[in-house]
Amino acid sequence: MSPYAIGVGDFNEDNRLDIVITNNGIEDIGVLLGYGNGNFENPIMYRTGSHSSISVAIGDLNKDHRLDIVVVNNDTGSIDILLGQHDGFLSQTNYPTGSNPQSVAVGDFNNDTRLDIVVVNYYSDDVSVLLGYGNGSFAQQANYSVGSRPLSVAVGDFNNDTRLDIVVTNSGSNDVSVLLGYGNGSFAEQTRYSVGSYPHSVVVGAFNNDTRLDIVVANWGSDNVSVILGYGNGSFAKETRYSVGSLPKSVAVGDFNNDTRLDIVVANSRSNDVSVLLGYGNGSFAEETRYSVGSTSSSVVVGDFNNDSRLDIVVASWRSNYVSVLLGYGNGSFAEKTRYSVGSSSSSVVVGDFNNDTRLDIVATNSDSNDVSVLLGYGNGSFAQQANYSVGSYPQSVAVGDFNNDTRLDIVVANSDSNDVSVLLGYGNGSFAEQTRYLVGSVPWPVAVVNR
C-alpha cells in the first residue's frame, strides 16, 4: 500500500476537520473523521477500483453544501467521484480519462455555476474535460490534444471574455499548450508556446500590471524560468527566459521592493542558493541576484518576519541541518542569511503564528531525525532556538490548520517510512502536545489542508 496524497476538510458537517487519504497499492481511499479535539476515528475505507490513486481534490460538486471527493487514478486512466452524504460518502462513480492522469483542476467552464473538471493525461498527451451537472455527476469526457508528456495544469481567463481557459506544461515537448474556452464547456484547439527544458510547474499572474494574465513556468531541465506575457486576447508573446540557479525546485512570488510589482524567488537545489528576480512592472525582470543558502535548497516561503512591511524569505535545505532566513530591505535586496538549527535533513517549511503574538513562526520537517522543528519568531526577524517534536519515520511534508476548533494552529505531518501521519495539537503558546499517529498505508508524501 502506498498512500499518495492527503486532504483535509469537514466531511460530516460537524465543524470538525476530517482527513482523506489516497492509497497507491490497494483499491481504497481512507477517510478519518475528526472528533474536534485533535483525535480521529479509525479510517473508513471507500473502494475506488484503482491500485494507483495519486491525487485528490475536494469541492462541493453537486451544490448540496457537502464536500465531495475527486480522485485521480493513473493506472486505470480514470477519475473517481465520491459524493458526500451526512453519514459518509456514496460509492464512487468512475469516469474514464486519458492514459496516466497526473493532475487535476476544477473550474466552471460553461458558465452554469456548476463546477467542472480538467485532468492532465501524461501518456495520452491530452487533457480530459468533464462537465458537471451540478448534482455531483459529470458528462462523459471530452479530450483535447496538448503537447508531449503533460504534467501540470492551471486555469485563468486569458482573453478577458469571462470564460475560463486552460494552460498546460508539456515536459516532453518543452512547451505549454493554451486552450481557449468558448464558455460552453468546449475549447479551441491548442496553441503551443515554447519554453525551456522539462517545464514542470506553471503559475499565472499579471506581471506587467495591465490586467491581462501572463504565464510563468519553472524549467527544471534548463535552469531558468520562462515568462510569457499575455496580450489579453488569448494569445501570448514569445517567452523571455531568465536564468536562475542549478535545478530550480521551488518558486514563490511577492513584491520584494514595495513597488507594487510582482517579483520572483526560486530555490535552486543543486547550486544551493536562491535567485531573486525583480519585476519592472512591464513584464520583464532584472537579472537574478543570488543569495547563498544551505545545501540542496528544497523549499522556499515568503513572509514578513520582522514586521517592517517588507517581505523576507525562509529556505529549507535538505542536506543540511538548518533553515536560512534572509531579511528583506524593502528595496529588493536581502541581508545575508541567518541560519537556525533544525533537525537532520530539513525537507519542507511552512510559516504560521503558533503562539498568537501576531509574529510569524517557522516549522520545518526533518527527514532523517524523524521530527519537526518549531522556531518561534521574536517579530524582529530573529527566532528562538528550535523546539523539536517527534513524529513518524522520514517526515516529508507539513501543513498547519486548526484541527480542534480552539483557534490555535496545529500541525499535521506526512511520514513516508512509517506509513502514517502525525497530528500535533497546539497549545497556543508556541508549544505542542505529543503527537498522535494515524496509520494511512505506505509512503505518504504530500499533505495539504483544505477548507471549504
Predicted regions and their residues:
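Surface loop/turn motifs at the tips and blade-to-blade linkers of beta-strand repeat domains
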Residues: 1, 46-49, 94-99, 143-147, ...
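Hydrophobic beta-strand segments that make up the repeating blades of beta-propeller
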Residues: 19-22, 69-72, 117-120, 144, ...
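Beta-propeller blade termini
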Residues: 4-11, 33, 54-61, 102-109, ...
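Blade-level signature of beta-propeller repeat domains, shared across WD40, Kelch, NHL, RCC1
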Residues: 79, 83, 439, 443-452
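Glycine-aliphatic tripeptides that mark coil-to-beta-strand junctions in extracellular
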Residues: 15-17, 65-67, 113-115, 162-164, ...
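Beta-propeller blade repeat segments, especially FG-GAP/WD-type strand-to-loop junctions
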Residues: 29-45, 79-93, 127-139, 176-188, ...
